[in-house]
Curated annotation (Swiss-Prot):
One of its GO terms (molecular function) is tRNA binding. The keyword Glycoprotein does not apply. SUPFAM superfamilies: Ribosomal protein S10. It comes from Dechloromonas aromatica (strain RCB). Involved in the binding of tRNA to the ribosomes. GO terms for cellular component: ribonucleoprotein complex; ribosome. Disulfide bonds: none annotated. Keywords: Ribonucleoprotein, Ribosomal protein. The keyword Hydrolase does not apply. Part of the 30S ribosomal subunit. This is Small ribosomal subunit protein uS10. The lineage of its organism: Bacteria, Pseudomonadati, Pseudomonadota, Betaproteobacteria, Rhodocyclales. Belongs to the universal ribosomal protein uS10 family.
Amino acid sequence: MANQKIRIRLKAFDYRLIDQSAQEIVETAKRTGAVVRGPVPLPTRKQRFDILRSPHVNKASRDQLEIRTHLRLMDIVDPTDKTVDALMKLDLPAGVDVEIKLQ
């Protein structure tokens, strides 16, 4: 796998889970001899929703909800076959979405 890099993008609602997963990926990649760039925290996406409290009247009375999506980006430069195998075997928490691209 000469002159290739792996780009990993993590997405989660809980920042603690995403930081823990990023740390596990960095440790695994460094253990196999690859060079890791990151994790780079990307801007947090905030979705806001306004919901009526009452089903009938009181239009002015509303609940405001927010969902925050945290993102991290990592590049693994010059990965070996051992690096790819170790990343495939890595067990990450269920709340973390992982996108892996070979470039």
